[in-house]
């Protein structure tokens, strides 16, 4: 792991390798949080000559880069600093540039466009560079935005597109560039297994997000259809949502996509993890104690480096679930 600190002063850009002054690094993300986070614990030892020579005065808004094996895995801005004691550590919390999309809002009136064009438009307005943007070729007839975050604008567009393509999408930062990818890609050449790298595994079932009835309404408010999971209703009672018909969208397919059964969640901790095990990807897990066997999708991840050891903690899901942001017709 290599950590670099970048700051601007008097028109110049200064870069320092501060790896020797960092005692631990935590790099994390989740599907719902969107922006990835890095926490670096910097040694606060004013009497240590090596640390003193670095002249560490890391400030809010300055850039931190993390490299592993020569590859850039994080490019983000310092948001806050927490000092533990006079001669202990200072922990800096950093977010990648997706945080700008989460913290900024806009007003737009889109028509006859696509999710990919909407993404490039709002990123250009926010001066965020774009990388690989998933092509949907799915036409969005109309979408009026009034004060939504830029992240929600993008995800509303891709949620609409997903109803036509059947795919799920996720936003990620690739360095300083925003990418939109098809969600759920399997981590290649890596397996989590109790005999190799799993140190702990937990299994949980929950119905907190259950939807077993979806009623379909037209633009006049009249019910025109329904999708239902009778066995789920019989066992758990009714958990109902509504779907309002949209032009160009198959209402039965869209309503079915809203159904949500029992969620099965898994937490796995392991050593010698793979850096591709991040929120949104899929990973194979084999653990006899919990009965886990097969492909699971990562809802959240935390990678920690300390004392030369890489520890990985993952929250897994049995289903590949998108961070959907529904566009309500009454927003028009």
Positions of the model-derived regions?
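Extended Gly/Ser/Thr-rich low-complexity repeat segments
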Residues: 50-62, 66, 104-110, 194-196, ...
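Well-ordered beta-strand positions in beta-sheet-rich domains
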Residues: 24, 72-77, 91, 105-107, ...
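Assembly/oligomerization scaffold segments
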Residues: 1-100, 188, 193-201
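Acidic, small/polar-enriched beta strand-loop surface segments
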Residues: 1-6, 10-12, 155, 159, ...
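Short amphipathic alpha-helical segments
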Residues: 54-56, 114, 118, 275-276
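Charged- and aromatic-enriched interaction segments used to assemble
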Residues: 82-197, 201-203
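Oligomerization/assembly interface segments of phage tail-like spikes and tubes
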Residues: 32-49, 89-98, 216, 264-271, ...
């Amino acid at each position: 792991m290599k950590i670099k600190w970048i700051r601007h002063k008097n028109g110049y850009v200064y870069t320092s390798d501060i790896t020797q002054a960092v005692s631990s690094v935590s790099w994390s993300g989740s599907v719902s949080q969107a922006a990835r986070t890095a926490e670096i614990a910097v040694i606060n030892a004013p009497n240590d000559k090596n640390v003193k020579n670095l002249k560490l005065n890391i400030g809010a808004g300055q850039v931190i880069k993390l490299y592993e094996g020569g590859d850039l895995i994080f490019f983000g801005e310092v948001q806050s600093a927490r000092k533990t004691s006079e001669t202990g550590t200072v922990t800096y919390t950093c977010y990648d540039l997706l945080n700008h999309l989460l913290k900024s809002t806009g007003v737009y009136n889109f028509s006859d466009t696509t999710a990919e064009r909407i993404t490039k438009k709002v990123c250009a307005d926010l001066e965020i560079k774009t990388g690989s943007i998933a092509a949907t070729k799915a036409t969005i007839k109309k979408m009026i935005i009034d004060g939504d975050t830029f992240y929600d604008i993008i995800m509303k567009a891709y949620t609409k597109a997903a109803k036509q393509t059947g795919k799920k999408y996720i936003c990620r930062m690739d360095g300083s560039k925003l990418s939109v990818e098809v969600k759920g890609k399997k981590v290649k050449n890596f397996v989590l297994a109790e005999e190799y790298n799993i140190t702990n595994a937990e299994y949980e079932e929950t119905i907190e997000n259950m939807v077993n009835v979806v009623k379909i309404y037209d633009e006049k408010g009249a019910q025109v259809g329904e999708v239902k999971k009778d066995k789920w209703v019989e066992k758990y009672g009714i958990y109902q949502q509504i779907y309002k018909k949209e032009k160009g969208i198959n209402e039965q397919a869209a309503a079915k996509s809203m159904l949500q059964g029992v969620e099965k969640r898994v937490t796995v901790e392991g050593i010698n993890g793979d850096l591709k095990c991040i929120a949104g990807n899929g990973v194979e897990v084999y653990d006899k104690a919990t009965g886990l066997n097969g492909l699971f999708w990562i809802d959240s991840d935390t990678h920690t480096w300390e004392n030369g050891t890489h520890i990985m903690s993952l929250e897994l899901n049995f289903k590949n679930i998108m961070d959907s942001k529904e566009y309500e017709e009454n927003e028009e």
